[in-house]
Structure formats: C-alpha cells, structure tokens
C-alpha cells in the first residue's frame, strides 16, 4: 500500500554566505555533508559529540581544490576561545590538492557551543560551522504522513521509520487520536537504532481527517515531537451488474441485477459471472451472502466467495454456480453484497430452471396380428428424446421369460435423437397375447406401450386380437362389464340387456335420469397407473380380474442345490367366467412353473408351484416369470358371436430371486452407481410426490437388489426387487405423501446381491408446503399526499416463501376500485420469488383515506380463489390534497442567441404543496419583428424542453433544461403553461382546458454582423478621396448586405472550411462585389487600403478573408488536375506573387470591438489583376469580393472610371434651380491627362424633350493631375416624372475612351408627398466614420474624416470644427490644407490653412462653406498635407548645402567645362516650395534604401553623379483626406422644403442690383437661352481669371469714387424716382419711416432736453407751482416722442445688410473662440451655471409709470400723472 511520507524540515544552513554567486554542490558522502564554494570543497559543519570537561578534542577540517586552477584563500580564526586553530596565513591550493586545518575544542562547562571559521576568496566569503553538543535524546521521523483513501468501516495502513539520531538510549510512546492508531505504541531505541511503526486508519464516518500525533521520548526529561497524520474516508458505493444479454423487461442502458441462467440440464452445473462495480474512489471490502430463507430450500445456487475487496473505480468478477436437481423446477434465490459496516446492500437476483429429458414413444401399441405356433414376428418401435439432455430408459420386461422381447430393453438415449427398437413376438401357446409394458425414464414420468398378438395352431384358432378390442376393453372396464365372459355378454346383448354406444362399446341400459351419459375411460397419469396397481400399494385404479400371490419371492440361500423348496403359487379368478392360465415356459431358466396351463372356474383359485433348480454354487439367480389368463371361451374364434365382447388376456408376472452362496462364502461385491435425489419435490399437504433413482451396474456380474419396503412404509418404491445385468441399469420410482410442513426423513435400505453387508441406505427428506405469502411492511402500504385528480404509484413487494409456484389474486372493494388499483392484479410467483407490484392511488377528495385490499393465494394447479386458498389483508393509508406549480422566475430573457445555434437555461419549477405533482408542459411560440406573419407561423418550435412531463415531489423544486434555437433574426417569445397530469388529462392533447400559465421566456435571434466603419488609403492610392474609395470598394452595398439575414446557401459551411477540390472554389454566396484598388503605374508603391471592421452586433463574430488557396483541400499530387484554365493560371500567378494581400486574414471581434485590416495591391506586372476573395463571417454571411487592380505602363495616360453607369441624384419636376452634380474621374497614371465630353447625345435628348435641357454638362473638357480626381459637373433638370438615360462618350486625349451611361430620375413631389431626396445628401453608412483608423507611419489624424453640411440655403455661411491631432509622442508636425479645384477654393475656407502642431497636441481648424450663388451638390475632398517638422528642417539644411555646392560647382564648370550652361540648366529645381525655401544637404541616396517601386528622379548619370550632387528630394507628406458634402438650395426652395430649418441660417441682404443679378430665374433662363453662356461656363481658368480681375477693378473703383456715391444718394432723394415703382414693399415702408423720422429732428436738437437735472427741476416745479403742470406734461410728452424717433433710427440701422453681416461675423468669431478655449480646457461647456443673487430694488411710487426705450439697452422711468393727461395727449402718445 502506497503512502506519501514527508521528510523532516530542512535544518538552517550552517554556512553563512557573505555574498551571492556561490554554487553549493552536495557531497555524496553520508558521514559528513560537504559543499563546494568557488572550487573549494569543504565540510559544511564540524561537530563534536561525546566530549568531556578538561579534555581537548581535535578535529581536522579538510579543504580541497576541485577547480582546474590554483586557488588562493585566507581565513579568520573562530571568534570564541573554545575553538582554536593555527594562526591564519595565506593558503594556495593547486588543482586536486588538499589542506588539513586542525581545530581544537576546549570546553569549560557542560553546555552547547557554536562558532565558525570564515574563509575569504576574491569571489567572496564562506564559513564552516563549528558545533559541539551535549549528549541528548533525539528521534527522527517524518513530519507528516499521508495515508491512502479508505472506505468507511474499513482500514488502511502505512509505515514509517523512527530513528534514534541522539546520543542516548531513549524510550518513546505515541499519543494518537482516533481513528488513527500506532503499532507499536511504545518502545525503546538505542543510539543509532531504528524501528518501523505502522499507522492504522479505521474511520467510522466519511470525513477528511487531519490530526496531530504526539511522540513522547526521553528518560530523565520528557520531550515531545509531533507528526501530522492526514487521511480521507469515503463511503463506498457498490452496484451489481450482469454483463452480456439484458434481462427481459430491463431498461436498456441501466445496470442489470438479475442473473438468469435459463434452463440447465438436471444433474449438471453452470457458472456465470457477475460484476460488482465500485462507483466510489476507495477500495470497498464487502460480504457476499445468501438472503435469509427457510432451511428446507435446496441451495441450487452457490458462490465460493464470501468476502472480497472491490478496488476503487474498479470491478470484481463474482462467479455464481447453478446446479438444479429437480426437473421442471423454477429456482429463484437472492445474494446480497454488503460493504463493511452494512451501510448499503445491493441485491443480486438469480433465476434458473431445471430441464430434463423429454422422451416419447412414437406409438402407443405394437400389433403383431396373428402368427402360427412356433413362428416369431418382429416389429419396430421408435423412441425419441427431443430434449438436449441425455435420457436413461428401461422397459420393465424380462425378455428371457416373456413372449415379447426387445433387442435393447435399457440404455441411454442421447439428446435430440431417435432410437429404433426391435420387438420380437414368440408365442408358446395358441392363444391371444396382450401385455402393457412400462418404459421407465430417469427424471421423467413412465411411458406405456401395449404389445399384443394372436397365435394359431392347427387345432386352436382363437379370435384375432386387434387394437379396437383394447379400446373397447378399457371402456367396458370402466362400465364394469369385463368381469363377464364373452358368451354371457353376447346373450345379454341379444336379450337387450346391453346396448352398444356410437363407438360400439358395450353399455348397460340407460338409468334414470336419462341425461346421465355412460362412463368413459380416461387416461390416468402414468405415475398413478404405475403405483396404483393394487400390488405395490393398497390402491388400484381398477379391481383385478385375476390375481397371483405372491408376486415376488426370494428363495434365499439354496444350498445344497437339490434342497430348494418349491414355491406354492396361488392364482385367483375374480371374474364370472371360466378362465385359462397359461405360463410361458422359460427354457434354460432355473425357475419353472407347473403346471404350464390350467383352467380356473369363476371366482375360484388354483394352485401352482414354482420350482427352483440351480445348477451351480455361489451364484445369484433372478428371473421374471410370465403367464396369461383369458376366458376359456376365447380359445376358438367360433365361440365369439359379437366382436365387441372379445376381452384381451391378462398378463401375470412373478419376480423370483435366489442364491447358492455357501454360509461362510462372501457374496460377490457389487459395483454400481446410485443416482438418487436428497429430497422429494415439494408438494402441497396430503399430495403424492414422486422422484426417480438410477442404479447402474458398472461391474461384469449381475446384481440383484431388494428394497425393504417394511423398513420405511411411508415411501413406496417400485420395483421392490429385481436384477441388473452387467452394463445395465435399473430405474426406481419413489413416492411419498407428506402430511405436515415439518421436514421428515426417510431411510430406505437397499440390499444388493442378497447379502446384508451390501445394504445401502437411501436417505430422503420430504416436506409438505403450506401457503405462505410475505407482505412488505407488515401488510401496510403508505402513500404520500396525492393531488386530487392525479395518481401516485407506489412499489409494494410480495414474496412467495414456499418451494412451489403460487398463484395470487388481489381483490379490491368495488367502492374503492376508483381510488385504488394494482398492477398486476393476478399472477404467478415462482418459488421464493419476490415481486414488486405497482399500486396506484387516485384520490378524489381532500381527505385522509384508510383502504383495505385482500390477496388470495393458492397453488398453481387449482384456482387461486378456492376453498383450499388463503388470503392476506393489506391496509392502505393515503391522503388527497391540492397543489399548484409556479416558476421561480416568471420571466426569463435569454438575450441574444446566434441563429441556428443552441442556448440553454434551467427553468426552476417550485411545488410548495404537500403532495407530489405530475405535470405536462406546453409551449406557445410568438415571433415578432420585421417579418411576414404568415411565413413565420409555419416555423417549427424553436424551443425544446428537456422533458415536457415529469413529477415534482412535495416541497421541492425541479429543473427543466430549456434549449432554444432561433431560426430567424427575430424576437421570440415562448409562453410556457402546465397542466396537472390526471387520468382525465393523460396527454398534451387533453390539456387545453386545464392549462395554467407558468412563465415566459424571451430570446432574440441574431446573426453575427460586422460592418466597415471606415476606410482610408495610402501608398499609390493615397490620392483617392475617402468618398471615391468608399465607392470603389462598394462599401455601401457591402454594409447594406451585411445587415441582412444570411441566405441558406451562405450557411452551407458555417465556419471557414477547406471544402474545394479545384483551384476555383464553388460560389455559394448570392452577392458578389468589386473591390477596386484603382490604378497606378508599374513600379509604384503598393496600393494600401485600411478597413476598420466593427462588430456592430451583440454576439462575438469570427471573420476571415479566404483566398482560393485557403478554400482548397490538401490533395495528393496524383489527384490534382494538370489541365489548368487561363483563369486558374491567372489566379495562381496572383497568389504565387502575392499581388494581393490581407493582414490579418482572420480574427475575432467581441461586440463593439474594432479591428483594422490592411489590404494591399502590388504593381509588379502591367495589366488588370482579378482575384476572388471570400469574406466569411462564421455562422453568418459569406460575400465574394472580387479584388481588382490595374497596373499601367509609365507615362501612359490612364483614367480610372469607377463604373460604366452613373446614377444622378433624383430631382423633382418643376424645380427652378436644379443642383449641379459631379462625376468623378481618377487619374491612375503618372502624367496629366486631358478629357473631353462628347455632347451629341445630350443634344439629342434635349431635342426629344421639346428643347428642354434635361442634361447639361458644365465642364465638357478639363485636365486631371496624376494621382488626383477630376470632376465633370452636370445639371439634371427633368421634365417629367420618369427615368432619363443618356450614353455619353468621354475621350481621354492620348488614352482610351469610355462610354458612360448617366441615369437620372425625375419624380413628382405631389405624388410622392415627401422630399426625401433633399434630405439624403449622403447615405448613413457613409456618414458614420471612425477616426481610429490610421495607416502605417501616420503621425497625425483628424477628429473627423467626413463633414456633411446637409441642406443649406444659397449664399449662407456654415462652419464646422475639425481638430488636427498630433499622435506622435516626441515629434512636431507641420500641416498645410489644399483643396481639389478652383470651385472648392471659392466656396470653402479653412482657417488656419497651415501651422505647426506640437507632440500630443491638437489644432482646431474651421471649415466654412459659403455657396457661390449656384445651386449645387458639393462633394469636395480637402487634403491636409502633414510633414514631420524634423524632416522639413533637415530637408532645408540639405537643400542649402546643395545650393552652395551647386554654386561652387557652377564656378568650377565655368572655368573648366564648355557645357556649364547645360549642367546649370539641368540642375534647376523643378518644383517650388510654398513655405520653406531652403533644401536639405546633398546626399547620395542609394536605390536600396528607397521604397519598392519608387520612381527615381535622378537627373545625372552615374558617371556625372560622382562629380555633381543630386538635388535632395522634399519629404513625402502624409495625406489626410477630409470629405466635405453639402447641397445648396435657392432661398425659395429651401423655405418651401425645410421650413423648420430656415430660421437657423443667416441670410445676407444684398443690394437691389445684386438681387436682380443673382435672381435664379433670370440667371437660369439666361444660361439656358444664351448659347454664349455655355461657352463662358466652359472657359478655361486663365480666361475666368482675366474676367474676374477686370470686374474686381471696376467694382473697386466704383466703391472708392465719392462722386458716384453722391450721385446715387441724390437720385434716391428725388421726389418721385423713376425706378421706385420696381422697389419692394418692405423697402418702401422703410424709406417712409426714414422720411418721417427726419421731421421732428429740429425739435429734438436741444442737447439738454432730456437731462436728469431738467427732469428733476420740472418735477419740483410741478410740486411747487400748480400753474406749470400743463407745461410739464407737454415736455414729458415731447421726450417720449424723441425716444421713439431714436428707436426708429436704430431699427433702420439693424435692417441694413452690413449690420447683419457684422453681427453674424461677431457671433461666429465668438462661438469659434469659445470652442477653441473649450478644446484647450479653458472653458467647461458642460459645467453647471452659477447663480448670483441680486440686491433688492428700492421702493418706488406706484404712481410712477415705467417705460423702456425701444431700440436701446437703458431703462428709464418717466413720471406721469394720469389725471393731467388729456385725451389729446393720450392720442398723441398712442400714435
């Protein structure tokens, strides 16, 4: 047994190391522990033991150099005076050399001493401990002992060693707490001795034991030391399992505890094994014993093992032996497997039956017909054994003395064989012969066969005996007519005293009552016929017609041979006719009967003699004599008048024995085998029981046997005596009739060979069985409280305690039959079988019940309920109650569940009642969301219950596992109800009316979704704007599709799988998108595209970009297809050269998580590259992305068209100012390209639409710089609500042309009732951008990548704030904004346009949009060029050095060279730096350091480069794209479509001339009608610039000319201006107010009219002089009028356009300053406002009227007396 023993804790290190780095190596010597320190090997401790006072003890410390170099060291002496060594001196040790240092110990007192010697080396110090200790006891043993797991009530043990490591002999004693014990508990250990101690763990309960054992040791002074004992005890759990075939009725998958042997041949034994399984983690000792049962039972089941140990988690094979003894007996027995402690019992049931031979005769009679005297006849008799058990058979006939003989009268009939026997008929007299011969079979009832035949002679010819005569004879015997001879029967038949039935058998006249039928012959059992012969027993089936006495006789010892006395034999005729007895002569036999034949009158007897004539001494003699008695009238057939009166003869037999052994001569020793059972088969009281015995003669001599029937009269044996030939056998049948149930022993003496010394006592036991049924629980059955209307089933066991099969029947009172039922109600219990019955109790009221049931039991043969049966009462106690079920959580939300995936939860059902409840659960499903109700109503149930029905015990809970699997991306609601399962509600279909709501479960089916949140480009695609990039990659369509539900074909492979066998995998996705990387010249930098993937769903998503090679399965080379298509070759070239790459190619995103993915296209080969890449989201979408990239030759003119079809924004019909729309062209080449739009098709469309210009191209020609995007402006003006198409050729000068289809849609706003098109400036997916996406090497980022101004009125200003953030930690950046076109410069303003951003800093940039007066759809790409400031500074230095070198070389070339002009011209800078004019120093940049595909711009050859420096190139900027979108509307359109938004914008008030010029209708009409306007719109930049400069000069001159201003002013002051009729109404009113306001200006010219002093003076004068009241009131009125005039003037000023523009600018600058300060943290916009309490106002008179000046910010109070105001004054005030 294994145990874990933990050693002593390590002692403190005796060596005190003074520095780190020393490596100590333990020595292999046990006597002295050594260590190695920097190559010096030395003992760690020197210890002195057994020292005495006054003596010096010397020990030597050895130092050895184990290093390969010479070691030098020194040491210091011990610090105390008790340890002395030699004076310190330097030590040098060569490799392998040793030094011995003596240490002297001088003690002065008895105590412990400790010191050390310190050694110094260059590497550090180490010390050796010197210790001297007193003699003391010390024991060494482990600190802790772990014992193995142990079963409760079992024991486990382990051992450990206790060693005396002290200096004294010591005693020890253990104190161990329970359940541990030590052996030995105490002892004595001498110095250095050790002993083994055993720890025994005997737990009584399951627990983890962790105790402390104490060891006391020492002689004078007791010391103790503790040990920790750890062990764990567990309860064993044993189960029995029968391997192999399952028992009938057993549930599959469960352990079988019934061992079925089946049918086993009698006398044989069969072994089968069962497994005892130990389900626990501990070894389980157990006992195997037989269940307690009566002692009378024969133990046909046996097991040799009574105690065993089953290993933990293992099994034990147990062999059970079955050896049945009685044929047809069904055996049942039980073994119990009980673990130690009787904690649990496991019962093993064993069943088996005994089978024997099944022998039958093919015919019941053998008819020899008739033969002549002296002849013989042979017939065949077949005997078969249909069983597989061998059968011993014997025909009870002696062929030597009978007219009938068999060739094999006895033998063994093997299983399933048939034997053909020859029966020979040799008659000795001319008479009829009939003998009924019994065939005895061991372990089977006897068989009977009739031998009959007729012998004729010349003188005697009796009637021929036939089979019908035997049948008539048996019927006549029953009717009592066979005692009359045939002649008398014939007379009675003639006289009518006898009749014949339908079978022609004789019968007497019918008796009263007439309906009583005549008696018929019925076959008796073979055993009854065999034993009830009137000879072996006193009973007989029928009275004998002829009897002979004696039937058996033993002549005894007949010596000398001539003195054998004859045996008198008496034959009696019991019939009423004269009979003749003829004996069959036995030729060669020592026994003869005289006379051979004799007639016997009716009812008379006749005497015969049996003579015994032996021929030799010391021999055994035995024989059977045969004779036939018949009616004398049957000797001649002519005497028979009626065939039905023929009566067969009766056979008489006599068994004779004798021997001629002399008196002192020992008889022959018999050699035999006796097979006899130990007990009689069980029967009921006063019933016959039978068994057979087999006596086999295994010797070479005949054996005679005799059973002393008188010695045991209670047992009948047949035959009583006889003989057995050598090799033969004799079958006995024994019978007894037990009366009581007390076991009775029977002893039968069997004497062999007529010698008392050869007597074998056969001991048999018999016992009558009485009905005994064992009821479980003393006949009481308790039911737990049961819910009304429901049923409770309880198991109740009854056991047959007898050895006979017992039938039972339960009777329940009729009134209780509705409440109580049992299954099965009747049945058969095999011997000692226990049956568990199912009792069902169904209460119907809330009450307690006391019911009674009766079981009637009886034997199997009669009816169970009969006078012979008995009954037992069973009391049933139960209670009816009410109960309900509730859910612990009435509402459960499972949240989001992946569509097609499983999610489960536990639904807890609570039963708070006192009764168990059987329930049935039902589920109703409700699907809500954006779906078709008719389509989803047919969906299968997406919720599955682990079990829909079950039982909850009282006051307990049940867990139901709920699994949901949504099939759609919708919201699911399941309402779960329950119904109590009752006989009225047996299943779910019957529960509709009994439903009770239980709980509600919700879940939402979701698909894993991702979307592209942002995209940016770099490398050769850095010039592509974000909006164009978004369209090139079809990201709108991709995002839109990613939000849909995946198609079933997309879920063919739910996760990325290698499923294709070809290079081009099959396509299962319904969507294919183009991922266009644009175009670039060959050798350019790779086009980089950064995509930001966002998991916008609620479940994690795994995504992957799968190239065709990622979808192909790995196959052997021979399986590959060698014939590749051009498409496959193209894809292989792309993948092999890695022209397209994705990094990372896969990942996993949690909800809300983002990840950047880099896509690249390398421009290594000229042409168009295509590669299908599958974007796969596990359990979601898979979309085929066609990667496409174009590589062109250098200097090739190439314009990349995003698509061949362009959709213009839909325009409402009747729109007076249709917006300008743009079509983008991207120049993917390296040179500037010119394009021209062919307008012929546009003219045709205009002609088809009544000369209405549906399509107007504003930029029919233009140029596009390399790597930039050009715009073609269009105006779409529909005439009807329909779709317009036009195919427009676009020619690229020096390049390819393209035919682009422009499609526009006109709609009727009145019909649609909405203006949605106005509101859809950009799609929502485009608006949502992320600023977290950066390209490699990006040093700055924008706070927004896209700005949408939305819909704005024309000529208004709108501003947005964007922050430029420097994400670098230590480098400042320089930025410069640039726009894409002249038009963008006109409408967009950026402040600041350039600047420097410090590390980790940010700069606010204000983007202001002011439409230029033409309604347009604005889509501008603002590019922020960002440089690292250090790189610019370095570039400036390099450029300055290069310029100085250039000047120096120019001088040198002027003197020495003739081509200086060309060189100078060649080295001129080709670019102009806008801000920084200096260049960095000249450096020779090797090609290896340049990026891949970089276009080298060296201007000198390699030869010239050695003399002239190459001009340094400016650093490449980082391009940050800012997309600005907006749509401008005319004021009228904006007001009509966006009324609520109109007040948010400031509309500048232009002059009359401006209004007339900018009027949209006039301007648009002029554009449409004047052809020259179109040519002006298509003018070049230079032409437009000239016109602009001229107009600016003219306008500036007019604004500066004062004479012009005066002339305009004078014209406005004319009485009736000529053009006043054209002015607006509001202008006229304003001018009228202005004229009116000038009237009282002279009156208001007094400067002191409204001073405070004058006001106070007038007030005091009013109080002092009443005569001045009227004058004061008029003065107050004039003051009010003057204030009104001032207010009117200020209002006029506010209405001026200049004033509004000024206020707008002030407000705009104020808000911008606030935002800038807030971004710097100076202002907190979200802080709570502070409230300052103002002081209270002083009290003023209520008579004072408060009025406020309109148009100013002051508040004045004017005193007024209402009584002094006249009506005229009031009217003036009101005016």
Curated annotation (Swiss-Prot):
The keyword DNA damage does not apply. Disruption phenotype: Loss of the expression of CFAP65 in testis which is associated with an inversion breakpoint into intron 3 of the gene may be responsible for the infertility associated with the Rose-comb trait. InterPro entries: ASH (IPR031549), CFAP65 (IPR052614), HYDIN_VesB_CFA65-like_Ig (IPR053879), Ig-like_fold (IPR013783), Ig_CFAP65_10th (IPR056305). GO terms for biological process: flagellated sperm motility; sperm axoneme assembly. Residues 1633-1645 have a biased composition (Polar residues). One of its GO terms (cellular component) is acrosomal membrane. Expressed in testis. Its main location: membrane. Keywords: Cell membrane, Cell projection, Cilium, Cilium biogenesis/degradation, Cytoplasm, Cytoplasmic vesicle, Flagellum, Membrane, Transmembrane, Transmembrane helix. It is a single-pass membrane protein; Single-pass type I membrane protein. Residues 1331-1460 form the MSP domain. The chain crosses the membrane at residues 84-104. It is found in: Cell projection, Cilium, Flagellum membrane; Cytoplasm; Cytoplasmic vesicle, Secretory vesicle, Acrosome membrane. Residues 1627-1672 are annotated as: Disordered. Plays a role in flagellar formation and sperm motility. This is Cilia- and flagella-associated protein 65. It comes from Gallus gallus.
């Amino acid at each position: 047994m294994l145990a874990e023993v933990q050693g002593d804790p390590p002692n403190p290190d005796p060596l005190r190391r003074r520095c780190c780095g020393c490596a100590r190596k333990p020595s292999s010597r046990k006597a002295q522990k050594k260590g190695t320190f920097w190559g010096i090997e030395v003992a760690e401790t020197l210890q002195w033991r057994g020292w005495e006072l006054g003596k010096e003890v010397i020990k030597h410390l050895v130092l050895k150099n184990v290093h390969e170099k010479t070691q030098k060291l020194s040491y210091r002496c011990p610090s105390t005076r008790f340890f002395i060594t030699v004076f310190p001196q330097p030590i040098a040790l060569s490799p392998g050399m040793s030094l011995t240092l003596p240490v002297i110990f001088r003690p002065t007192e008895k105590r412990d001493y400790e010191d050390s010697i310190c050694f110094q080396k260059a590497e550090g110090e180490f010390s050796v401990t010197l210790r001297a200790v007193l003699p003391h006891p010390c024991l060494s043993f482990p600190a802790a002992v772990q014992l193995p797991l142990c079963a409760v009530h079992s024991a486990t043990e382990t051992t450990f060693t206790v060693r005396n490591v002290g200096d004294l002999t010591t005693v020890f004693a253990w104190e161990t707490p329970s359940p541990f014990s030590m052996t030995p508990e105490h002892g004595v250990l001498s110095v250095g001795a050790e002993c083994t101690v055993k720890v025994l763990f005997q737990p009584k309960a399951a627990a983890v034991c962790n105790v402390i054992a104490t060891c006391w040791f020492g002689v004078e002074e007791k010391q103790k030391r503790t040990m920790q004992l750890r062990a764990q005890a567990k309860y064993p759990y044993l189960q029995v399992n029968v391997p192999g075939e399952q028992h009938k009725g057993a549930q599959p998958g469960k352990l079988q505890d019934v061992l079925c042997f089946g049918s086993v041949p009698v006398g044989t034994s069969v072994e089968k094994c069962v497994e005892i399984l130990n389900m626990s983690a501990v070894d389980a000792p157990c006992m195997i014993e037989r269940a307690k049962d009566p002692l009378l039972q024969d133990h046909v089941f046996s097991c040799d093992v009574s105690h065993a140990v089953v290993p933990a988690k293992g099994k034990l094979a147990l062999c059970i032996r079955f050896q049945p003894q009685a044929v047809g007996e069904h055996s049942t027995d039980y073994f119990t497997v009980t673990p130690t402690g009787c904690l649990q019992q496991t019962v093993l049931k064993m069943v088996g039956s005994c089978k024997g031979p099944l022998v039958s005769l093919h015919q019941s009679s053998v008819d020899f017909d008739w033969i002549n005297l002296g002849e013989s006849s042979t017939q065949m008799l077949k005997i078969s054994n249909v069983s597989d058990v061998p059968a011993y058979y014997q025909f009870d006939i002696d062929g030597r003395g009978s007219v009938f003989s068999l060739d094999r009268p006895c033998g063994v009939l093997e299983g399933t064989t048939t034997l053909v026997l020859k029966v020979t008929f040799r008659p000795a007299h001319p008479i009829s012969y009939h003998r009924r011969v019994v065939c005895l079979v061991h372990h089977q009832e006897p068989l009977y066969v009739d031998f009959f035949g007729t012998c004729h002679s010349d003188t005697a010819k009796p009637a021929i005996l036939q089979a019908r005569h035997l049948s008539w004879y048996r019927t006549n015997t029953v009717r009592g007519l066979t005692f009359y001879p045939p002649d008398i029967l014939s007379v009675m038949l003639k006289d009518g005293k006898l009749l014949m039935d339908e079978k022609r058998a004789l019968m007497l006249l019918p008796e009263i009552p007439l309906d009583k039928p005549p008696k018929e012959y019925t076959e008796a059992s073979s055993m009854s016929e065999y034993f009830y012969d009137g000879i072996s027993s006193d009973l007989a089936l029928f009275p004998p017609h002829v009897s002979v006495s004696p039937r058996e006789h033993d002549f005894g010892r007949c010596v000398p041979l001539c003195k054998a006395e004859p045996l008198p034999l008496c034959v009696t005729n019991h019939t009423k006719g004269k009979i003749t007895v003829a004996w069959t002569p036995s030729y060669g036999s020592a026994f003869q009967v005289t006379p051979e034949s004799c007639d016997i009158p009716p009812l008379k007897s006749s005497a015969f003699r049996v003579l015994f004539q032996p021929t030799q001494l010391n021999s055994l003699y035995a024989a059977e004599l045969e004779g036939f008695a018949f009616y004398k009238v049957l000797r001649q057939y002519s005497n028979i008048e009626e065939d039905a009166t023929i009566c067969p003869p009766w056979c008489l037999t006599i068994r004779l024995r004798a021997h001629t052994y002399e008196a002192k001569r020992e008889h022959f020793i018999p050699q035999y085998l006796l097979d006899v059972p130990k007990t009689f088969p069980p029967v009921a009281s006063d019933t016959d029981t039978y068994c057979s015995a087999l006596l086999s003669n295994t010797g070479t001599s005949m054996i005679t046997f005799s059973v002393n029937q008188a010695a045991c009269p209670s047992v009948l044996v047949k035959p009583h005596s006889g003989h057995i030939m050598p090799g033969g056998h004799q079958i006995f049948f024994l019978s007894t009739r037990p009366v009581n149930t007390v076991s009775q022993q029977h002893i039968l003496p069997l004497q062999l060979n007529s010698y008392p010394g050869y007597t074998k006592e056969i001991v048999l036991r018999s016992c009558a069985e009485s009905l005994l049924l064992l009821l479980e629980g003393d006949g009481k059955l308790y039911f737990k409280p049961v819910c009304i209307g429901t049923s409770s089933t309880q198991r109740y066991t009854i056991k047959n305690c007898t050895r006979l099969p017992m039938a039972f029947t339960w009777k329940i009172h009729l009134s209780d039959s509705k409440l109580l039922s049992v299954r099965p109600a009747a049945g058969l219990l095999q011997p000692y079988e226990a049956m568990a019955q199912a009792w069902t109790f169904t209460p119907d009221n809330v009450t307690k019940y006391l019911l009674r049931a009766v079981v009637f039991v009886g034997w199997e043969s009669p009816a169970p309920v009969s006078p012979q049966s008995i009954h037992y009462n069973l009391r049933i106690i139960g209670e009816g109650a009410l109960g309900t079920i509730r859910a612990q959580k009435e509402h459960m939300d499972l949240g989001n569940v992946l569509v097609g995936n499983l999610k489960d939860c536990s639904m807890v059902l609570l039963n708070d009642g006192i009764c168990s409840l059987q329930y049935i659960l039902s589920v109703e499903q409700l699907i809500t969301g954006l779906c078709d109700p008719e389509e989803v109503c047919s969906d299968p149930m997406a919720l599955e219950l682990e079990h829909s029905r079950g039982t909850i015990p009282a006051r307990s809970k049940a867990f139901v596992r709920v699994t949901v699997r949504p099939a759609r991306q919708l919201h699911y609601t399941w309402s779960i109800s329950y119904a109590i399962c009752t006989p009225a509600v047996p299943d779910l279909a019957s529960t509709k009316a009994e439903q009770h709501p239980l709980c509600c479960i919700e879940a939402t089916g979701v698909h894993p979704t991702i979307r592209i949140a942002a995209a940016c480009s770099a490398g050769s695609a850095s010039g592509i704007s974000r909006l164009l990039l978004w369209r090139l990659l079809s990201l709108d369509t991709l995002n839109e599709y990613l939000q849909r539900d995946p198609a079933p074909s997309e879920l063919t492979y739910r996760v990325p799988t290698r499923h294709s066998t070809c290079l081009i995998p099959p396509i299962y996705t319904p969507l294919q998108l183009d991922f266009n990387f644009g175009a670039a010249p060959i050798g350019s930098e790779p086009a980089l595209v950064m995509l930001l993937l966002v998991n916008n769903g609620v479940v994690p998503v795994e995504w992957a970009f799968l190239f065709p090679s990622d979808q192909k399965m790995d196959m052997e080379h021979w399986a590959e297809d060698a014939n590749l298509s051009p498409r496959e070759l193209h894809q292989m070239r792309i993948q092999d050269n890695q022209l397209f790459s994705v990094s990372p190619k896969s990942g996993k995103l949690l909800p809300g998580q983002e990840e950047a993915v880099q896509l690249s296209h390398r421009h290594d080969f000229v042409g168009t590259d295509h590669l299908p890449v599958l974007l796969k989201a596990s359990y979601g979408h898979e979309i085929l992305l066609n990667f496409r990239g174009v590589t062109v030759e250098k200097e090739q003119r190439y314009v990349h068209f995003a698509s061949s079809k362009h959709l213009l924004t839909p325009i409402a019909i009747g729109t007076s100012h249709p917006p300008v729309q743009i079509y983008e062209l991207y120049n993917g080449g390296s040179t500037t390209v010119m394009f021209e739009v062919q307008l012929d098709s546009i003219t045709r469309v205009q002609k088809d639409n009544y000369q209405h210009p549906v399509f107007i191209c504003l930029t029919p020609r233009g140029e596009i710089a390399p790597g930039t995007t050009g715009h073609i402006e269009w105006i779409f003006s529909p005439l009807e609500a329909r779709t317009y198409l036009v195919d427009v050729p676009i020619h690229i000068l020096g390049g390819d042309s393209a035919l682009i289809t422009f499609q526009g849609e006109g709609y009727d706003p009145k019909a649609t009732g909405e203006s949605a098109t106005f509101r859809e400036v950009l799609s929502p997916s485009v608006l949502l951008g992320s600023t977290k996406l950066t390209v490699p090497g990006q040093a700055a980022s924008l706070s927004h990548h896209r700005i949408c101004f939305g819909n704005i009125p024309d000529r208004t200003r709108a501003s947005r704030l964007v922050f430029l953030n420097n994400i670098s930690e230590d480098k400042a950046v320089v930025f410069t904004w640039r726009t894409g076109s002249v038009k963008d410069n006109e409408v967009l303003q950026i402040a600041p346009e350039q600047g420097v951003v410090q590390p980790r800093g940010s700069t606010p940039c204000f983007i202001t949009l002011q439409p230029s007066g033409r309604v347009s759809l604005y889509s501008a790409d603002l590019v922020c060029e960002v440089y690292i400031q250090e790189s610019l500074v370095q570039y400036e230095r390099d450029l300055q050095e290069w310029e100085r070198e250039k000047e120096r070389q120019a001088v040198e070339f002027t003197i020495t060279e003739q081509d200086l002009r060309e060189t100078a011209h060649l080295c001129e800078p080709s670019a102009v730096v806008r801000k920084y004019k200096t260049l960095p120093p000249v450096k020779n940049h090797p090609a290896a350091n340049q990026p891949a595909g970089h276009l080298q711009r060296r201007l000198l050859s390699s030869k010239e480069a050695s003399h002239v420096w190459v001009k340094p190139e400016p650093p490449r900027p980082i391009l940050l794209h800012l997309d600005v979108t907006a749509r401008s509307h005319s004021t009228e359109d904006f007001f009509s479509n966006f009324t609520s938004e109109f007040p948010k914008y400031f509309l500048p008030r232009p002059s009359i001339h401006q209004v007339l010029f900018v009027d949209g209708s006039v301007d648009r009409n002029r554009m449409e009608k004047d052809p020259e306007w179109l040519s002006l719109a298509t003018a070049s930049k230079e032409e437009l610039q000239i016109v602009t400069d001229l107009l600016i000069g003219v306008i500036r001159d007019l604004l500066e000319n004062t004479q012009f201003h005066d002339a305009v002013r004078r014209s406005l002051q004319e009485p009736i201006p000529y053009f006043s009729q054209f002015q607006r109404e509001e202008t006229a009113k304003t001018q009228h107010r202005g004229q009116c306001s000038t009237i009282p200006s002279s009156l208001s010219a007094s400067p002191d009219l409204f001073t405070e002093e004058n006001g106070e003076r007038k007030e005091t004068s009013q109080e002092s002089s009443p005569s001045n009241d009227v004058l004061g009131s008029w003065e107050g009125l004039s003051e009010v009028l003057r204030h009104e005039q001032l207010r009117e003037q200020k209002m006029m000023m506010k209405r001026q356009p200049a004033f509004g523009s000024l206020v707008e600018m002030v407000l705009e600058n104020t808000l911008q300053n606030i935002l800038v300060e807030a971004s710097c943290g100076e202002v907190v916009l979200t802080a709570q406002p502070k409230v300052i309490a103002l002081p209270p106002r002083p009290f003023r008179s209520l008579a004072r009227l408060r009025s406020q000046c309109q148009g100013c910010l002051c508040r004045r109070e004017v005193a007024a007396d209402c009584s002094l105001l006249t009506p005229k004054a009031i009217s003036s005030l009101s005016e």
